[in-house]
Amino acid sequence: MALSGIELLDHAHRLDSFDCGKPALNAWLAGFARTNQARGFTRVPVVHDEGTVVGYYGLAPGVIQPNSAPRAIRTGRPPDPIPCLLIGQLAVDHRYAGQGVGSGLVKDALYRCVAGADIVGGRAVVVRAIDAEAERYWQSWGFIPARDNPSVLMRSIQDVSLWLADKGH
């Protein structure tokens, strides 16, 4: 096993054996990740084992409605809608679970979100949890549910930036 660093998905990466145990996330990687990235909708950083993708996430710009956002995100008279960065998917092949691949991908995503917000603006990092297990996972990273939808979770860019600096990540 020789895990790569995190790099953008390309045509050399093999996707056919990826299985995170969640069919929707498997299907998105196989059916949409390359096309969405090529069309500029999403960036898809991956970790691979000798070319076979073992973990990935999708990153895209997005917006949230102020009435959905927690107070920490909607203070200071933000625009309507509020610009954000969306971690649209996050998955690790079940054969690589518990090896730090997911944590590494989350930290990379958070760094990229802070860097992106420094360039184009953005008030929050937003995730859309696929199920209750994913909701709990993102809450363990300090994300809080939207006021109107517990499957949409967010964390302010300022909070993420401070957390990354404080933890020495």
For each of these PLM feature ranges, what is it?
Residues 88-98:
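A short, internal acetyl-CoA/4′-phosphopantetheine-binding micro-motif in the GNAT/acyltransferase core
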